[in-house]
């Protein structure tokens, strides 16, 4: 059952526990979970071709051994395998490849594989962020399928392009402009159309980096002639 279905059934306590229950963990309890998850990943990574390109036959059994055996690495240490997208060398089967620029690197871009389990974790994380962004106290939040979200994101294959897809698996929030249209527009075009639509449809959410928020504020200023808008 996804977030939309639980909201419809008014299962608010269950929603909070599923997505935000981690806030009740003690620091020791939280770190115990993180250590267990890290050691699961170490085992997977150690047994794949990518991991062995660094480990050279070693197999760390726990986090302490991993720290002793594995040197600090950079993207360049994995680039030959990742840039050629060799799934047989990875610990899991990628369902999508994300990319970003590689400043000063030997190739114009960097790519990173995302498995289904990684996407599931990403989906849960962005849903938790959505809930917490509207929360004033434990268990209290204000999220609905009728909410509107400004699409001020870089589309796929950039990582932020996963955001509307992941959220769409949980709830039918409307993006302004619609994702299918936004991905074919420039950043400036998306912002201008999104703000024009928001003036008519009641914008509820915005997600972006600080630099993006600044660029968006400039777009808003140009649309309002520098007068700004009244926020309720």
Report the location of each language-model feature.
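Nucleotide 5′-phosphate-binding alpha/beta core
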Residues: 1-99, 103-232
